[in-house]
Swiss-Prot record:
Entry keyword set: Cell cycle, Cell division, Chaperone, Cytoplasm, Isomerase, Rotamase
Domain notes: Consists of 3 domains; the N-terminus binds the ribosome, the middle domain has PPIase activity, while the C-terminus has intrinsic chaperone activity on its own.
Entry keyword Cell division: yes
Gene (name only): tig
Signal peptide: none
HAMAP family listed in its UniProt record: Trigger_factor_Tig
Biological source species: Francisella tularensis subsp. mediasiatica (strain FSC147)
Subcellular location per the Swiss-Prot or TrEMBL entry: Cytoplasm
Keyword field contains Cell division: yes
Protein name (record): Trigger factor
Example GO molecular function: protein folding chaperone
Sequence similarity: Belongs to the FKBP-type PPIase family. Tig subfamily.
Catalytic activity, EC: 5.2.1.8
Sequence ranges assigned to domain PPIase FKBP-type in this UniProt record: 160-245
Pfam families: FKBP_C (PF00254), Trigger_C (PF05698), Trigger_N (PF05697)
Length: 438
């Protein structure tokens, strides 16, 4: 086999590979003879079909099957010999004739080689959130609202009321697509509508019609409406007032708590603290990763981005429960491309840093992290034992420990400031970030 490096520029490289004719023809001949012993053909007994007839009828097909098997073997050997770190490969067949050498080009995308420097340029705003009894009481109030019952009343609309409305949205005086609805239930103050919409209904009566003006958010998914000033013609058809359940032993049992109200409040606070800790860690880590992407200079392999896009599509399909009749591959790649590119770049950067720095996940550190994570489950010890039996889960935990250590290492060199934030705003932002990332 002869290998010629045709060109090598950045992360792109082409290998011209030539396989001697006798090697190809020998394998093809053996395959034809093997096929002749098993194939059924009219006029011949099984195993007695002449090799010449098999070659005449199936020779091209057999040759292509042989080549399809042989090409990956040959380019894998060439890549190994040339000591190339390959991210993606495309094969272009050049010459394929009996009695002639097989020639093909392996167009490669290589993993970029780079070193990250300038960690002191990274700026991180570390959120500081105080969790007090006030936030715990508000969380319990939110849980009460989830179990609220509603009854129709004759009064003006107030916060927390459920209203049934019709509305027509207009932009520049013309109704826009998706802006009209009938018999829609809205809980005032829930934030299910765009900012300003629910506030505009407060004070209205049953049967009243009113036109309000609202501006769509800058990050609204429909770009034609983002930041647009619009009007909504609203008709209130029904007003229902919420009745919240009393916080007692019966109420807390709905959440699987057996120790009464005091135990319930303690568990709520512990859950809030645990959730807050992981969210704040994630916020800091996201800023660190963003900073790393800004200071690192390298070309990102498109094949890795494509692979990540495909994985994101399959993950979305899994979240949808398999969705029969829905072809996730019909979704455009650009819907996933930005997140995919970020994930690939972050992974490459972390690998680059870890090649120079030794970060290890000690067994005790993995155990400690696991203990924290399982507390969110109903049966922590049982869940812990199940996870410990799963090698993939343990590998993920080790990777997370190392990722946390790397993040702390970068933070020691970065510019870190603190910013006080509200607990519920942090939770809301986290939910929005998760939704944006599918």
């Amino acid at each position: 086999m002869q290998v010629t490096v045709e060109k090598k520029e950045g992360i792109h490289c082409s290998l011209l590979i030539e396989v001697p004719a006798n090697e190809i023809d020998s394998v093809v001949s053996k395959e034809i003879n093997r096929t002749a012993k098993t194939i059924k053909m009219d006029g011949f007994r099984p195993g007695k079909v002449p090799a010449g007839m098999v070659k005449k009828k199936y020779g091209e097909q057999i040759r292509m099957e042989v080549i399809s098997d042989l090409i990956p073997q040959k380019y894998s050997k060439a890549i190994q010999d040339e000591k190339l770190a390959v991210a993606g490969i495309e094969v272009e067949l050049k010459e394929n004739k009996e009695g002639q050498p097989l020639k093909f080009v392996a167009n490669l995308e290589l993993f970029p080689e780079f070193e990250v420097t300038g960690f002191e340029k990274i700026e991180v705003q570390k959120p500081v959130v105080e969790l007090t009894d006030k936030e715990v009481k508000q969380m319990i109030e939110n849980l009460r609202k989830q179990f609220a019952t509603f009854s129709e009343v004759d009064k003006v609309v107030e916060k927390d009321d459920k209203v049934t409305i019709d509305f027509v949205g207009k932009k520049d005086g013309e109704a826009f697509e998706g802006g009209t609805a009938n018999d829609i239930d809205v809980i005032i103050g829930s934030g299910q509508m765009i900012p300003g919409f629910e506030d505009g209904i407060i004070g209205m009566k049953k049967g009243e019609q009113k036109t309000i003006t609202v501006t769509f958010p800058q990050d609204y998914q429909n770009k034609d409406l983002a930041e647009a000033e619009t009007t909504f013609d609203i008709t209130v058809k029904k007003i229902q007032q919420a009745e919240l359940p009393e916080v007692n032993d019966e109420f807390v049992k709905k959440f699987g708590v057996k120790g009464g109200v005091d135990t319930f409040e303690n568990e709520i606070k512990e859950n809030m603290q645990r959730e807050l800790k992981f969210i704040l860690q994630r916020k800091v880590k996201d800023q660190v990763f963003k900073g790393l992407r800004e200071i690192a200079e390298f070309e990102t392999p498109k094949s890795l981005i494509k692979r990540e896009i495909d994985a994101a599509k399959q993950n979305l399909l899994k979240q949808m429960g398999g969705a029969k009749g829905f072809d996730v591959n019909q979704l455009p790649d650009n819907l996933f491309e930005a997140n995919a590119k970020q994930k690939v770049e972050t992974s490459l950067i972390l690998d680059s840093i870890m090649n120079l720095q030794e970060f290890k996940a000690e067994e005790a550190e993995v155990e400690s992290l696991l203990d924290e994570l399982v507390q969110a489950y109903e049966e922590p010890e049982k869940t812990k034992e199940q996870i410990k039996k799963n090698d993939k889960e343990i590998a993920n935990l080790k990777a997370l420990v190392i990722e946390n250590k790397l993040t702390d290492w970068v933070l020691e060199q970065a510019k870190v400031t603190e910013k006080t934030e509200d607990f519920f705003e942090v939770i809301k932002e986290n939910m929005q970030a998760q939704q944006a990332g599918f």
